[in-house]
């Protein structure tokens, strides 16, 4: 395992001991222009994250709560604590917390280093 990726995994194992872990940003060795980001994202009850894309792959683990996830072209999927999901590069998606509890997500992105993490997009048309 490459040293920088080993640091990411070591941090993930140790992070529960931290009160408020920082976001992690690590360059991908031998892959210029790519980085790995690991972030914790919370969604309050009644809140949503509108349609958006990432210039990279998103892998998410639901730490707590329940979420309605919609990926363009697919049905709404209900995900709960312990579930994981993957969203391919540049795929529009959105999420809503319709429950009474906050949702906590641990998200890993393998993405282009340049540019914003998330890019808002219009809702996909339904055919």
Residue locations for each model-derived region?
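Positively charged n-region of N-terminal signal peptides that target proteins for export
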Residues: 1-4
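N-terminal signal peptide c-region/cleavage motif recognized by signal peptidases
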Residues: 14-16
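Extracytoplasmic/periplasmic copper-protein system
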Residues: 20, 115-127
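A short glycine-rich, His/Asp/Glu-containing loop-to-beta-strand
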Residues: 20-50, 108
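Short acidic-glycine-tyrosine-enriched beta hairpin
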Residues: 28, 43-44, 67, 73-90
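Short, conserved beta-strand element in jelly-roll/cupin
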Residues: 55-69
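Ligand-binding loop in jelly-roll beta-barrel domains
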Residues: 68, 90-116
């Amino acid at each position: 395992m490459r040293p920088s990726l080993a640091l990411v995994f070591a941090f993930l194992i140790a992070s529960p001991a931290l009160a408020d872990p920082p976001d992690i940003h690590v360059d991908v060795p031998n892959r210029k222009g790519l980085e790995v980001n690991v972030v914790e994202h919370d969604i309050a009850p009644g809140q949503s994250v509108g349609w958006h894309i990432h210039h990279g792959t998103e892998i998410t683990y639901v730490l707590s709560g329940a979420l309605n996830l919609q990926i363009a072209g697919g049905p709404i999927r209900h995900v709960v604590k312990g579930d994981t999901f993957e969203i391919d590069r540049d795929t529009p998606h959105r999420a809503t917390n319709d429950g009474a509890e906050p949702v906590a997500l641990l998200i890993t992105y393998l993405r282009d280093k340049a540019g914003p993490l998330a890019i808002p997009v219009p809702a996909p048309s339904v055919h």
